[in-house]
C-alpha cells in the first residue's frame, strides 16, 4: 500500500506539467501561427544605435537607443527627423494628427534594446486609415506604412511609444476651421470644415456683392410694392383676369426680395449662412442648428417658383382672352381656381422634396440659403428644369397671343374702334418687349448656371490644392525651408454672379412695369382725393348698359318721379385698371360721353316701357290682352347687332332709298306702298321724345294723322267686335296662328297683332266701313280688315309692319342709326 502511493503522486505531477506546457504552446500557436514559442513576435532583431534626438514630434522619449530598420525611406537619424517634420503637415488635419503621431514615432524612432526593436501593432496602424484618408487620396501610403504588412504590424503587441503623451494638438489652417460636427468636415480632412466666408472670394468681393444685392433688391422691393399698392388702391377695377395675375406675380417677387434683403438686418447674415462653429451651412436642415437658413430658402425658392409658374398662367390667360375679344364669351370663367391650385401646389412639392433630401446650402457671397450650392445636379433638377419648362410653355402662349392680336387687327379692321386699335398696337408692343426681356433674363440665368456647372470641378481642384499648399506652409515652418506662396488659381467670376442676380431682380422689375401707365396716375389721384375727402373732376367712364340697368332697377321710383336723376356710385363707374392694354374689349366705353345722353337715360328707359307697371297695357281698346305667362315669352330682352350687320343694314337702307320714290305724292300714287302714321300713344305719362328721323313722323304725316284720327282708331267704332268669343290663341296670331305658321316678319310687341292673321278673320262680323285716305285698301272688303287692333298698312317687301312702340323697332332704329348712342 505504501509503495503504490509515491508512484501515484509522481504520475499526477508529470500529468500537470504536460498539460501546462501544452496550453502554453497552443496559446502561442493561436496568437501567432507563423511564430513559435521560442521567438518574440513583437520584436525584430536588428542593430541598435544611440538616439541623437531625445524628442519625437515634440514629445520626450523614455529610451536611449533606436533603430532605422523600420523606416525604409531613411538611412540616418537626420533623415528620419526630417521625414517626421514633413509628416507634421498633417497637423492641419486634427483628427488625423491625433492618431498618426504614435505610429510615426514607432516607425521612425522605435525603442531598441538588446539587439531587438519593438514593432508597432496592427491596431496602431489601422487607427490611422480613416482619419488620414487624405494621405491615401493625395499621395498614398508608403510600403513600410501599409497595414497589410503583417510582419511589420503584428497583432496584439504593446509598444513603448503608445504610452507617450503628445502635447501638441492638431489645428485647422485657413480657409478651414476646426469643428467637431461631422457634417461640417471638409472632404478627407476630418475635424476641419470650410469657413463661413466663401474662400473662393475675397473680403472686398464679398462687400461688393452685398452692396450690389442691397441696391437691386431694394429697387425690386419698391417697384413690386408700388405695383401691389396700385392694385389694392383700385381693387374693384383691378381684380379682373388676366390683369390680376400680375398682382400675384409681383407679390411673389416682393416676398422673394424680402428674403434677399433679410441678411442686412443686424447680425442676420451670420445667423443665416454660418453654423455655431463658424463653418458654412451645408446640407440643411439639421437638428443642431436654427431654422433661419431654411426659412430664407423657403421664402426665396418658393416665391421664385410660384412667380415663374404664374408667368405661364399669365401668358395662357392672355392667349385665351385675346381669342375671345369681341364676343361675350368669358374663357377664364371657372378656371381661376385651378390657376391657384397649380401655382401654389407645385412649388410646395418641390420645396418639400429639397428639404427631405437636405440639399439646402448657404452662400456667404449672396447671403442666402439656396439649393445646389454644393451639388449642382440638384440645382439643375429643381431650378433650371422648371424654369426651362416654363420658358417653353409661356413662350408658346405669349407668341400665340401676339399672333391673335395681330390677326384681329389685320383681318377685322372694321370691327375695331380707333381706341381699340390703338390699344391693340400698344399691347402688342408691350408684349413683345416683355417677351424679349423674359426670354433674355431666362437665357442669362441658364448661361450663368452653365458657367458654374462647367467650371465647378476646376474650382474644387484649385481649392483643394490651396488647402494642401497651406499644409506645406506648416511643413516649411518645421523644416526651415522656403515658404511657398499659396493662392487659388481658378476662381469663379464675380461679374457672372452679378449678371445672374440682375436677371432675377430684373425680371421682378419688368413685371412691375405693367402698371407704369397713365391709368396708374389717375388711380393714385382718385385715391388721394378720396383720402382728403375731395371729389375729383375726372370724367367718369360709365358703360351705357350699366346706366340702363341702373335705371331699370329704379323703375318704381322713376315711375313716381320721371324727372328724377340717377346717381352712380364708384362701383358703377368703370375706371380703367392699372394694367392698361390687358383688360380691354372691342366696344369698351369712351371717356367722352354726352351729358345729355346721361341726363335722359331715364326717359329712354321709360320710352321702352321698362318702368311701366305690370297692370298697364299699351294695347288700344278692343285688342285682347294676352295672359302674363304668354306675354313674358315674347318680350325681346336684348338686341345686340354686330358691326357687320350694321353695315349691311345701312347698305340695304341706302339701296331702298335709291329705288323707292320719296315724298307724299309718290306714296299716294303707289298703292302697294303706304307709310304708317303715328297715332297718340296709349301708354300713360310717357315722356315726349326729341325729334328723330327714324322715330318721329314727318310734318305731312302728322297733318294727315289729325284729319283721319277718328277713322283710323278701331277703338272709336264699338260695332267692330267679334260676334263670338274665341280662344285667345285663335284670336291672337302671335301665339296661336303664327306659332305654327312660318312668317318672314320679325317678332314685334306681343301686345299688338300682326297682318298675317287675315286668314282667320272670318270669325269677325263684316262691315261696309272703309277707312279714308291713303290707307284705304283697294278692292278689299270690310270683312278682310284686321279689326280690333291698331291699323297696320301693307308695306313693301322687307319692311316691318309693326307698331312704332315695339321694343325691337326702337332698338333696331337706334342701332342702325349712325348718330345713335347705341
UniProtKB/Swiss-Prot annotation:
Protein name: Protein smoothened
Glycosylation sites: 34, 167, 472
Basic residues biased stretches: 647-658
Any one GO biological process: endocrine system development
Effect on the protein upon substituting residue 379 to L: In b577; recessive lethal mutation which shows defective anterior craniofacial development and small dysmorphic improperly looped hearts with reduced numbers of cardiac cells
Free-text disruption phenotype from the record: Abnormalities in body size, abnormal development of the central nervous system, adaxial mesoderm, cartilage and pectoral fins, and reduced expression of ptc1 and foxa2/axial with most mutant embryos dying by the end of day 4 although some survive to day 6. Expansion of venous cells with a reciprocal loss of arterial cells.
InterPro entries assigned: Frizzled/SFRP, Frizzled/Smoothened_7TM, Frizzled_dom, Frizzled_dom_sf, GPCR_2-like_7TM, SMO_7TM, SMO_CRD
Originating species: Danio rerio (Zebrafish)
GO cellular component terms attached to this protein's record: cilium; dendrite; plasma membrane
Subcellular location: Cell membrane; Cell projection, Cilium
A Pfam family annotated for this UniProt entry: Frizzled
Residues exposed to the Cytoplasmic side: 234-241, 315-335, 403-430, 525-822
Membrane topology field: Multi-pass membrane protein
Cysteine pairs bridged by disulfides in the record: 42-157, 48-112, 56-105, 96-132, 125-147, 172-192, 196-274, 293-369, 469-486
Protein function: G protein-coupled receptor which associates with the patched protein (ptch) to transduce Hedgehog protein signaling. Binding of sonic hedgehog (shh) to its receptor patched prevents inhibition of smoothened (smo) by patched. When active, smo binds to and sequesters protein kinase A catalytic subunit prkaca at the cell membrane, preventing prkaca-mediated phosphorylation of gli transcription factors which releases the gli proteins from prkaca-mediated inhibition and allows for transcriptional activation of Hedgehog signaling pathway target genes.
Subunit text: Monomer.
All residue ranges annotated as the FZ domain in the record: 43-160
Family the UniProt entry places it in: Belongs to the G-protein coupled receptor Fz/Smo family.
GO terms for MF: G protein-coupled receptor activity; oxysterol binding; patched binding; protein kinase A catalytic subunit binding; protein sequestering activity
Keyword entries, A-Z: Cell membrane, Cell projection, Developmental protein, Disulfide bond, G-protein coupled receptor, Glycoprotein, Membrane, Receptor, Signal, Transducer, Transmembrane, Transmembrane helix
Spans annotated as Disordered: 645-687
Ranges in the topological domain labelled Extracellular: 29-212, 263-293, 357-381, 452-503
Gene3D superfamilies xrefs: Frizzled cysteine-rich domain, Rhodopsin 7-helix transmembrane proteins
Record's comment describing the protein's domains: The N-terminal extracellular domain mediates sterol-binding which is required for maximal activation of signaling. Contains a second sterol-binding site within the seven-transmembrane pocket which is also required for activation. The activating sterol is likely to be cholesterol. The extracellular site is required for shh-induced activity while the site within the transmembrane pocket regulates basal signaling in the absence of shh.
